Swiss-Prot record:
One of its GO terms (cellular component) is membrane. It comes from Mycobacterium tuberculosis (strain ATCC 25618 / H37Rv). Its cofactor is heme. This is Cytochrome bc1 complex cytochrome b subunit. Cytochrome b subunit of the cytochrome bc1 complex, an essential component of the respiratory electron transport chain required for ATP synthesis. The bc1 complex catalyzes the oxidation of ubiquinol and the reduction of cytochrome c in the respiratory chain. The bc1 complex operates through a Q-cycle mechanism that couples electron transfer to generation of the proton gradient that drives ATP synthesis. The cytochrome b subunit contains two ubiquinol reactive sites: the oxidation (QP) site and the reduction (QN) site.
Amino acid sequence: MSPKLSPPNIGEVLARQAEDIDTRYHPSAALRRQLNKVFPTHWSFLLGEIALYSFVVLLITGVYLTLFFDPSMVDVTYNGVYQPLRGVEMSRAYQSALDISFEVRGGLFVRQIHHWAALMFAAAIMVHLARIFFTGAFRRPRETNWVIGSLLLILAMFEGYFGYSLPDDLLSGLGLRAALSSITLGMPVIGTWLHWALFGGDFPGTILIPRLYALHILLLPGIILALIGLHLALVWFQKHTQFPGPGRTEHNVVGVRVMPVFAFKSGAFFAAIVGVLGLMGGLLQINPIWNLGPYKPSQVSAGSQPDFYMMWTEGLARIWPPWEFYFWHHTIPAPVWVAVIMGLVFVLLPAYPFLEKRFTGDYAHHNLLQRPRDVPVRTAIGAMAIAFYMVLTLAAMNDIIALKFHISLNATTWIGRIGMVILPPFVYFITYRWCIGLQRSDRSVLEHGVETGIIKRLPHGAYIELHQPLGPVDEHGHPIPLQYQGAPLPKRMNKLGSAGSPGSGSFLFADSAAEDAALREAGHAAEQRALAALREHQDSIMGSPDGEH
C-alpha cells in the first residue's frame, strides 16, 4: 500500500517559489527598497488618485458597454421596449444606446456610472492640476509631469466629448454640428477639405460616429493609459513633493511607507471612489437620451449645454461678437476664433512652467512646495484663469439664466462679454493684494507673536493687546523676530495649546465619564475665577473715592 501524502502547504509552496526566484534574479533587495518608499500624508495628494481610480472605473464600465453598443449610423426603425419611440426612425447607434438603457441587464446603471466617472475623471485632473499650480509642484525637475498632466486634461476633454457624442441623440448631434462641423467649415482655405475628410461628405454623413467610436475606445484610451503610466513612473522615480514643516527638507520625504500604510489607505480610497460612483450611477440620473430623441438636422433645441469641462468653449462661442475678418479673399467667421483661443489655451497650459522659469530666472531644483500666499503673482494668475473659466461656463447657460431669472438674453450675452474682459483683471488685483496681506499677517506673528485677546492698560493710560511670542525674547521682553520658513503659522492661542487638548468623544460618541467630569470641573473652576475677578474689580471701584457717592 502506498503511503498517503499530506496536502501541500500553500504558504510553504509560495515561499519556496519566491526563494527560487530570488536565488536566480535577486529581486528582493530592489523590491524591499521600493516597498520602503515614503509618501507624504497630506490630503491634497489624494486628488491625483481620484483621477486614477476614476479612469480604472471608466475602463471597466467602458469594456462592458462596448459589448452591446453598435456605432453604425444606418437608419433603422425602433421597435424596442420604450413605447414613446416605437416606430421612430433613428440610427443604429441610438437604437443600441436605448437597448443598453432598457433591455441589457444593468445597462443603464453601468452607462450612468461610466458618464459620472468621466465627469469625475476630468474634475479630478482639473483640481489636481490646480493644486500643483498653486503650490509650485511643477517647478524643476517636474516640468515633464506638468506637461503630461496638461495633456491628460486635454485628452480627457476630447475623450469625453467624443464619448457623449456616440449615442447620436439630439443633444450630442447638436454638439457635433455646433462645435465640430461649423468650426471646421469656417476655417479658411482648408475648412471644406477638412470637413469632407472628417464627415465623408456633408454633415452628418454616415462615417463620423464609427470614427469617433474608434478614437473613443482604442486610440485615446491607449494614449491616456500610456501617459498615466509615465506620470506614475516619474512620480515614483523623482520622489514626491511635500509641504514645508518640521523635519522636512529639500532632500528627504516625511510620511508613511508604501507598505503597509499607504497601500491599505489607497485600497480603501479606491473602494470609496467605486462606492461613490456606484451610488451616483444608481441614484442620480444623467444624460437621459430617451427624453432627447434621435438627432435630426432640422431640429434644434434650446437649453443645450455640453458637460462642464467643455462648457467654457460653448460660452466662448455664445458671447463672441459676430466679427468677420477677410484675409487674402478668404472669410474668417466668428466661430473660428473659438478654435484659435482653444488652441492658445492648450499651448499656454503645458508651457507655463517654462514661461515662469524664463521670467523669474528660477532654475533650481525644488522638492518643497510653496504656499500660494508666498507667490502672489502666480496665485493671482491662477485666480484670474479660474475667473475666466467661470465666466465662460456661466455664459454657456445664458439662455437658461435668462429664462429662469426673466432677464433679456441679449443682456446675459453682454454681461458675459463685459465679465470676460473686466472680471479676470479685477480678480487678479484682489488676489494679489490678498496674498500680500496674508504675508504681512505672517510677518506680524513672527515679529510680535500671537494675539492673546488680553487687553492691558499702561500706566500712562494707553491700551495694548498682549502677544504671546513664538520664540525667545530680548532683555527688554520684546520678541526676537523669527525667520519665515514657508510653513503655516499659529494665529490663535488655541493653536499653542492654551485651550487644552480636545476630548476623546466625537459627533457620534460621548466623552468618557471621567473625562466629562473633569471638563465640567474645569469649566466650573474657570467660571468661579471669573466671578471672583469681577467681584474684586467691583469692590475696588466701590472703595475708590469716585465710587463712594
